[in-house]
Amino acid sequence: ATAKKDVTVTSKKNDNVPAATDNLPVNSYTALNYNEVKGVWIWYSELYPILTGKSESQLRSGIGEYYDNCLSLGINTVYVHVRPFGDAIYKSDYFPWSKYCTGYIGKDPGYDPLKVMIDEAHARGISFQAWVNPLRCYYEDDAPDVSTTYKTGQWYDTKDGDYIVKVKSYWWLNPAYKEVTDLIANGAAELVSKYDVDGVHIDDYFYPTTEAYFDSIAFNASSYSSLSQFRLDNCSRMIADMYKAVKSHNPTALFGVSAQGNVTNNETQLYADVEKWSKEDGYVDYMAPQIYYGFDNGG
């Protein structure tokens, strides 16, 4: 039988990662969310022309135009990419400045792009959801530039394929470790605690591969006999930790997942137990499946 204990592998490193969501205050802001959501994603490539190397006033003008276009289409909610690659378009204690701010990873743009985008959204009555990719980290060429001030920089520096693992051209965090999922939860808590975001949102990037090499060290150190169940439980723990982090720091903010539209693929290819998250309390406020196909598709 598959063992269902010891989901979190004991670290063999002295990383001194703080307990999840330590020392972050509760935000008294009342989140702006709608019963009927009409929303759009604004991903990092769409931020590039209005953010990268731009001044605060230029960003304010550019994002304002985006939002005005949204309003003209009846859109009341935006899901804005604030952490696409283990980085941040805001001042973070856990992740370096995104290269999409200045063109260089770790470089402070001299103002707070996230606050600008939130303020402009709220001025128009638009709900602002902070969209993060929790596991996807840096492109291979950017990774050496990440300061070891940050845990992801420290973990990359070890190059051991354990906490952070290279898959094709990108480095990915391994959610088998509590230190890793604590970092992810801290990142969610930081957004909700320090900013008047209306929610935290993630998409369909979970495990990047079905190959066993990705987490073989952690799996072999666990009591699991099934790699699939090991990964499903790791993802579920990460989602539960993020949900708790959001709700602990602003109970009115939402936490949701936009997973793939095919339940089987989610569970067998990405190890995202979307059925569990949808049915049980403590995981998500909503699911927004990515249904990019017609009724004739069997997915």
Predicted regions and their residues:
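Acidic-and-aromatic substrate-binding clefts and catalytic sites of carbohydrate-active enzymes
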Residues: 56-57, 83-88, 107-108, 261-270, ...
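Active-site-adjacent "subsite" loops/lids of carbohydrate-active enzymes
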Residues: 30-59, 129-130, 135-190, 194
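Catalytic domains of carbohydrate-active enzymes, especially glycoside hydrolases
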Residues: 61-87, 195-197
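Aromatic-lined substrate-binding rim segments of carbohydrate-active enzymes
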Residues: 66, 84-133, 227-249
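Active-site beta-loop-alpha junctions enriched in small/polar residues
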Residues: 43-47, 83-85, 133-135, 202-207, ...
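Aromatic- and acidic-residue-enriched carbohydrate-binding clefts of CAZyme catalytic domains
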Residues: 35, 46, 86-113, 142-174, ...
